[in-house]
Swiss-Prot record:
Entry GO MF terms: ATP binding; ATP hydrolysis activity; ATP-dependent DNA damage sensor activity; damaged DNA binding; single-stranded DNA binding
One GO CC annotation: cytosol
Gene name, Swiss-Prot/TrEMBL: recA
Protein's recorded name: Protein RecA
InterPro entries: AAA+_ATPase, DNA_recomb/repair_RecA, DNA_recomb/repair_RecA_CS, P-loop_NTPase, RecA-like_C, RecA-like_N, RecA_ATP-bd, RecA_C_sf
Pfam families linked: RecA (PF00154), RecA_C (PF21096)
Species in which this protein is naturally found: Methylobacillus flagellatus
SMART domains, per the entry: AAA (SM00382)
GO biological process: one example: DNA repair
Localisation per UniProt entry: Cytoplasm
Organism placement in taxonomy: Bacteria, Pseudomonadati, Pseudomonadota, Betaproteobacteria, Nitrosomonadales
Family named by the database record: Belongs to the RecA family.
Function comment: Can catalyze the hydrolysis of ATP in the presence of single-stranded DNA, the ATP-dependent uptake of single-stranded DNA by duplex DNA, and the ATP-dependent hybridization of homologous single-stranded DNAs. It interacts with LexA causing its activation and leading to its autocatalytic cleavage.
PROSITE patterns, per the entry: RECA_1 (PS00321), RECA_2 (PS50162), RECA_3 (PS50163)
Amino-acid positions noted as binding ATP in the UniProt annotation, renumbered to this chain: 66-73
Alphabetical UniProt keywords: ATP-binding, Cytoplasm, DNA damage, DNA recombination, DNA repair, DNA-binding, Nucleotide-binding, SOS response
Amino acid sequence: MDENRSKALAAALSQIEKQFGKGSIMRMGDTDVAADIQAVSTGSLGLDIALGIGGLPRGRIVEIYGPESSGKTTLTLSVIAQMQKLGGTAAFIDAEHALDPVYAQKLGVNVSDLLISQPDTGEQALEIADMLVRSGSVDVVVVDSVAALTPKAEIEGEMGDSHMGLQARLMSQALRKLTANIKRTNTLVIFINQIRMKIGLMFGNPETTTGGNALKFYASVRLDIRRTGAIKKGDEVTGSETRVKVVKNNVAPPFKLAEFDILYGEGISREGEIIELGVNLKLIEKAGAWYSYKGEKIGQGKDNAREFLREHPEIANEIDAKIREHSNLANAAMTTAPDEESDE
């Protein structure tokens, strides 16, 4: 570039920074723009691996959707617990007015430090989310759920009134405002969403999510979570087998699957994942119903092996570290393993 053009560009860059603030424009090579994306662990080792970067990306929008009782809120509370372990601040915008603080505490959430809002309208919920993001002092904001973000006009109207497209317009406008602030403040914003059926569809997938198409475009990561079976102890159901598909991923290759157990009153079973992933990677030997590690039997049946790892956290952490190393998640191991060890 000749000298005159260089001077003109330097003057333009200086004017932009003066008018819009430092960092409003930059060269990709000058700054930490090209640095690795920071991630927040989901609390599920398998899902962290499937996401490719060791968790959910900071400074991005994430959508978690699935049928009722599939584990959507459990997964987001698990993310909040992981963020709090690292000293971060989390906010939960409970548009459904359904958050159970006792359950959240059982999943490891520090309820006394959790910011919670139960807004009356969709506009209020999204305005609160935007203000929290703009403050730059909140690390994770969860909105539960998009389906419950009812526009003010609908709340104030009559029961039978038609309000076509109001919610979709509300989401589209809010996401346009939110996106730039989220990136600038490096906040992780998670939207929980529900599934609806398209009526009269002859071909293709009849399932869709609520709130229009805007969230599908603005979300960097979309997770489809499903309950695939029940975990039983005798006749008693103690948890659910869960599968998560990474439907969209702008920060790593998409379409990967993760499977884990959600135990009632405990949340995601870390020990269960260590056993499954350990067997897959041949770190744990399985012969019949017996599980062994380094030639030593650790339990007959998955429940007993899980109990052994719970009682011996040093062995669980050792296998965890090997799984992370094999999956190139060594950095994530450094941030999560010590915290989990201290919890045992």
